[in-house]
Regions:
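N-terminal leader/targeting segments and the immediate start of mature chains
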Residues: 2-5, 10-66, 113-115, 125-127, ...
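Intrinsically disordered, low-complexity linker/loop segments enriched in Gly/Pro
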Residues: 102-148
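Short, hydrophobic/aromatic-rich segments at coil-to-beta transitions
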Residues: 37-43, 64-69, 130-137, 158-161, ...
């Protein structure tokens, strides 16, 4: 389970002593280990853009496999089942941020790398879902990513609560357990998806995916973000080949989607819902016009700059303003 991202930081960076940074790294290591070693089930609340939803989660680690099931309890039933971070089935329209793309399993947390892009600190203690927690803050060192405040369970290292704020201190996203049981291991029945949970089949063209990573690049990326994977598949509606490139800094992530327009008339767009932004820009290449779309939990100005920086290695590519 990804620790879904900060209440306003109460301590300025110059109050943070190195010992706190070392302690914060230790807690992040525990967090990474807990999600790969600790079974649990519980109920959590997810808040975004002023809207709340409640979810059950079952997370089982067994024989080296991490199996997870999420079920939304409010409104129409929405469900997702994952194995080792890869989505197996979904139902309903999952809230963005809770359901990742089928093949976008997160990389293990690496505090040594993260401290290059975030200031890490233990800033206090709290109590969440009846459990004692340690508060770890990750404050971005630049304007190209958001900050996190993680309330980690003292007993297991699991994230009991996480908050995400923009550079103005506004809450973008909240994840918080209301109950958590780490003693009982979820059963096969607990992890069994309902009949409405439709299997995910990704018709990925591996050869095209490799070519995408070779042909496309960005002239500019936020410091610390690296290409982690690429995919290519045919859109069932437009019948065009959609290529995507995925980047992350070890915590935040975004995707770049590239699709030929084939003469279609489209307009540039920029939208934001909570922490998730989507910026689309038309790009002229020797092979024709393309639509470049950047989607992720990054500031909208950063997403726009990335979209305008995409280049085709086969020849010059220019964005249309």
């Amino acid at each position: 389970m990804r620790a879904i991202p900060l209440l306003s930081l109460l301590l300025s960076g110059w109050f943070i002593v190195p010992a706190h940074a070392d302690e914060a790294q230790d807690w992040l290591i525990r967090l990474g280990q807990a999600e790969q070693q600790q079974s649990f089930h519980g109920t959590f609340v997810y808040e975004r853009n002023g809207s709340f939803s409640t979810h059950n989660i079952w997370h089982r680690v067994q024989n080296g496999e991490v199996r997870e099931r999420l079920l939304q309890l409010d409104g129409s039933a929405q469900e997702v089942v994952r194995i080792d971070g890869h989505t197996q089935c979904v139902s309903g329209t999952l809230i963005a941020g809770l359901g990742d793309s089928p093949n976008s399993a997160a990389r293990p947390l690496d505090p040594q790398k993260l401290k290059n892009w975030y200031e890490l600190a233990v800033i206090g203690k709290s109590r969440v879902a009846g459990r004692d927690a340690v508060i770890v803050s990750l404050t971005p060192r630049d304007q190209h990513r958001y900050g996190f405040e993680l309330h980690l369970d003292k007993q297991t290292g699991l994230p009991l609560k996480s908050l995400l704020l923009n550079d103005k201190g506004q809450l973008l996203e909240r994840f918080q357990f209301t109950s958590l049981d780490t003693d009982e291991v979820p059963s096969d029945k607990d992890l069994l998806a309902d009949a409405d949970c439709k299997p995910i089949t990704l018709d990925s063209d591996k050869a095209s995916a490799v070519k995408t990573a070779q042909v496309w690049h960005s002239d500019w990326l936020p410091p610390g973000f690296e290409l982690t994977s690429s995919t290519s598949h045919k859109d069932p509606e437009t019948k065009t080949q959609v290529n995507s490139l995925m980047y992350d800094d070890g915590l935040a992530r975004f995707s770049v989607f590239l699709e030929p327009l084939n003469g279609a008339t489209v307009t540039d767009t920029r939208t934001q819902l909570g922490p998730t932004v989507a910026v689309s820009r038309r790009l002229t290449t020797p092979q024709g016009e393309m639509m470049v779309t950047v989607v992720g939990e990054i500031p909208i100005g950063t997403a726009e700059r990335i979209a305008l920086s995409m280049r085709n290695n086969d020849g010059a590519a220019t964005s249309k303003q």
